[in-house]
């Protein structure tokens, strides 16, 4: 049996590195494992919304965010078939802006911070099985590193392996897919914004949208995502959905002089936190493994870092109590639910409306004419406000309802 630890973390993405960073700072002897060598490419939209940038800054990386080759955005534009909304991003302690940074770089930097805090990192090491005591309590895990199996003892394991499906993870439904490619020389109306597109073709497909996020080095991340349920109903595949987005008239114009860099890459997402367990005796899950991707924006980095920070705090508390029971670790899941539950639940409500754009388009049009409502809508996309904050603008719903009734009467 290998060396003993206070905590073993499976997966060195944002959630795992955050857990290892905060746990090490709290004095826990922490081992961080990942199947891959870092840095490594990670398909993603690459956007760091303001709340995510705040979490990154809390890990001591505020100056790194400001490096000149990083993309910055101070506005968000949403285009639907009949409406156009543009708002500045919500201000944070780090400033009224978000960032666009390749995940390859972000993840490597977060891992560097975890190691600088004292965490031990082992790459090319795949966790395979939880170890348990004769009484059934978690006692560590087994891993493969190319040289045969190796065991690591620890009373606590945090699973942060995304959709990897490690045995200790809580199974969650992968309910969305996305695809992105990098292009150099992308046009566009305002490169200080991130751009969200909900085109007529996408509306007919259901809950999906496209995006253009500008990096700071002349490239842009151009992608599209859709719920697996909506995609299945169309009979199309993700590549076709993405290619048709690139052929939209506005996108075709933006890409007219652009050159692709590298292949398009796809990935699966566990969006929305409802229905997933995040703890059991001796185990907590964080980030994508805990289904914490925002149900509207698809952003997961900020929630992963936040959940890692909370999990590390509860790992420290469990060691203080010398109690690693499910009852103790339920404090982590409860705290996460209190902080993000209503936001995710209301986000699901909006996503469930997306396949019925006859209802949603009038709402977007009404929001476009009301500054407060349009800000609330944009902030719901970024995860900086719950969708139900729109209820503070009843006149918008009245206008939208009038529009819907008028459309029905004309039909």
Predicted regions and their residues:
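Glycine-rich FAD pyrophosphate-binding loop
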Residues: 8, 24-44
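A conserved beta-strand/loop capping segment in the N-terminal third of enzymes
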Residues: 53-108
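Predominantly flavin-linked oxidoreductase catalytic cores and closely associated redox partners
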Residues: 113-255
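FAD/FMN-dependent oxidoreductases across multiple families
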Residues: 230-314, 320
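C-terminal helical "tail/cap" subdomain of flavin- and related membrane-associated enzymes
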Residues: 316-411
